[in-house]
């Protein structure tokens, strides 16, 4: 597997928000842009890093939320002024909140994403155009005054040019667990996370993988400010992304600590 050692620098982030309010039509909008650079070691291409520009637009009205985004990613040799294999990723998501109160909340998201790959110096590959369809329910349930059960489940279907891009045709991703509130300042959330790529077509073996983690968050609220230390503990992780050269699954072990 290719090994990445990212050192991420946010070099540009711009955003603006506006609201248009009418008596029966209350729309809220925000729009922004970001340019992200990652230093990459051992990527397999003689490049300095990854370039990841993106722009986004969000709109909300009552129970509806609409999100549009455009993202691009690919390795770049900045000194030579050239890039390696890269892709475009326009995306649309629509979320509807069916129910929302202190006892129970339930919403549903539908989405579409297109991957436009542009291969550079890869024999037998020129371009690929792959689509991903998404449906994702989310929930929040009050068990007691201090204990809640919440989470989300995303189900994806990939189509077109999968043998070129190396993706599996189906994927599920979920994070769900319990949150206990000790007081107005401290709360603890412990979740189970799973992401699994697999093929519904038994004749296919490309792009299969599995990641299982325990994710713990310590939510600290200090007046108008909040900070959340977190950790991710790997339970099981393997992948089959090198399926064209080696169909054996490769194991991994990644843990993480962080702050946001």
What are the language-model segments listed below?
Residues 33-35, 55-61, 92-96, 135-141, ...:
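Residues on the lipid-exposed face of transmembrane beta-strands in outer-membrane beta-barrel proteins
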Residues 1-30:
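Cleavable N-terminal export/targeting peptides
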